[in-house]
Curated annotation (Swiss-Prot):
Membrane topology: Peripheral membrane protein
UniProt similarity note: Belongs to the ABC transporter superfamily.
Name this protein carries in UniProt: Putative ABC transporter ATP-binding protein BT9727_2424
InterPro entries linked: AAA+_ATPase (IPR003593), ABC_Co_transporter (IPR022216), ABC_transporter-like_ATP-bd (IPR003439), ABC_transporter-like_CS (IPR017871), ABC_transpr_CbiO/EcfA_su (IPR015856), ECF_ABC_transporter_ATP-bd (IPR050095), P-loop_NTPase (IPR027417)
PROSITE patterns per UniProt: ABC_TRANSPORTER_1 (PS00211), ABC_TRANSPORTER_2 (PS50893)
Residue span, ABC transporter domain: 5-246, 300-533
Keywords: ATP-binding, Cell membrane, Membrane, Nucleotide-binding, Repeat, Translocase, Transport
Organism listed in the record: Bacillus thuringiensis subsp. konkukian (strain 97-27)
GO molecular function, one term: ATP hydrolysis activity
Amino acid sequence: MQPIISFEQFNFQYKHAAQPTVKDITFHIYPGEKVLIAGRSGSGKSTLAHCMNGLIPFSYEGTSTGNILIAGKDPRKKSVFELSKHVGTILQDQDAQFIGLTVEEDVAFYLENECVNQDEMKKIVSESLKKVGMHTFHKQSPHELSGGQKQTVSLAGLLTTNAPMLLFDEPLANLDPASSLHTIELIKNIHKQYNKTIVIIEHRIEEMLNLDLDKIILIDEGEIVAIDTPERILASNILPSIGLREPMYIEGLKRLHFDSNNDVIYPLENLHKESISGVIKEWMEKKAFCKDTPTKKELLKVENLSFSYPNKQKGLENVNLSIYEGEIVALLGHNGAGKSTLAHSLIGINKTKNSRILIDGVNINSWSIRKRGEIIFYVMQNPNHMITQSTVIEEVSFTLKLKKVSKEEIKFRAEEALKICGLYPFRNWPIQALSYGQKKRLTIASVLTANPKLIILDEPTAGQDYYHYKQFMSFIRKLAKKGISFIFITHDMNLALEYADRAIVLHEGRIIANHTASIVLGHPATLQRANLKESSLFKLVKFSGIANPEKFMELYFDDIRREEGV
C-alpha cells in the first residue's frame, strides 16, 4: 500500500529564521490510519501540519529541501485550494475558521466555491450536519455556539469536501471534558464510517489515547525522536524527556515504585490487579501522616449571590463561598454551569443585588470595575481578547505605564514576569508572531506585573505544553505562598488535583461541592452531575479494589505538595 502522506529527509526554514524549524523529517502515514503528532510548544509539529495542508509555502514563506508527497503529489507544486480537496483542516482557534453568518452558510462555503447548484448544496449541507448531530442548529450563528459545537460545525464543513485526510490542530484545546469526549467519539465515528485518514497535532497524550491511535509520532526541537504504537511509546519513558506528560496513572505507578516486570502498562486494564493493590496499600501505610492545616485569613467572602440575565436565564442562585489569602481554588463545572458568570460578578461586569461581596471585610458591591481591578484581576481564556499592544514587552509594560511606575521599575518587573512565563527570549517580538499558547502566557505575564490580591484565571493552562504548564504552575504556587489568592476556572482535572487547595463545583448556577480537590474529584455522583472526567489515577486506584480510594488520592497529592515544599 502506498502512503497517503510521505516525508523523506524533509527540511524547512522560515523566511526570516536563522535555522530550519524542522530537520531531516522522515515518516509515512497510510490511508485510514489515525496518527498523533505530538511535541511541546515550538517543537515543529504545527510546521509539519502547515506543510501538509499547503499553508507552507503559500501563506508562510521559506525554503525547503527533501521530499514531501500528499496523495502522491508534491504539495509545494499545488495551490492551497487544490490541497484542500485532499486535506481538510480544523484550526485550534475555531473562531478564525468561521466565514458564514449561520451554521448552514459556513458549512456550505466549500460547495459555493465549487459552484454546486443550490438544491444539491442544501441537500449536502443538511446531510453533513446530520452526520455530526448539528442539524437542529443550522440557522444559528457559529459564534453563539459552545466550543464543542463549534468544533463539530467545522467538522461538518470538512465532510462536504470529501477530503480523504482530516487534519486537526489541537482539537481539545478549549473544550470541557464532556465536549472533549464527544469530539473524540465523533472523530472515531467519522473514521469508522468513511475510513478517513486522521492526523492530529496535540500535546495532550492521555486524552488522545481514547482515539485508539495506530501510531504516535514524537517531534522535539524540529526532529523526529520516535515513531511507534501507543503501547510502546508509553512503555519507553520518552515522553517526560521531551517535555510531554504521561497519563497520570503511569506517573502514579512510577511514584509508587511499581515494577511491571516488563508487562504492558497500557491500557490500564492490562495491569495485574493484585500487584497494584499490594503496592498501593504498602505505600499508604508508609505515607500516613497528619496533615498540617495552618489557619489563613479570609480574603474574599461571597454571601447569597444570585444573578439572572436579561432573558430571565438564571446564571447564579444563592452562591456562598470564601477564598483565603494564598489559597488556590479550582472552579469546576460543565459549560454553562455558571463559572464565568461568577467570575464576572466578582469583577463587577455583572451587577448583583441583595448580595454581598467582601474583600478583607469591606463590601465592594458599590465599587466600579476599575476600582475592583486594582485588587481582583481576571485573565480571559482567549488571549486575543486581552492583548492591545504590538510587541511583547509593550504589552507586559502597559498596565504599569498607566499607573505611572518608573521606567526602571517597569523594565525590571516586566522582564521578571516574562522570564517566569518563558517569554523573555521573545520580548521584542511582534505579538502576531506568537503562537496561541505563547499569547496565553503573555496575558498572564501582564497581570503578574501589577501585584494583585486575587487573580481569576480562565483555563490558565489551555494551549500550553507540559513543560510550560509545570513552570507556570510552580510560579503560581510561589505567588500563593506570598499571599496572593487564585481562582482557576478550568476543565483540567489533573490541574485541579495537583495544584488546587480546594475545588468548588457549580451546576446550573448552584454550588454542589466544595472540598479538597481529591475528595470532590473522587466522588462519582458529583463528576457525573457536573459532566467532569474521572482522572486515570483514580481509575487505577478503583481498579486495584482498595477500600478507600479517596483517602489514597488525598495522601498522594498531599505527599507531592510536601515534597515541593508547598
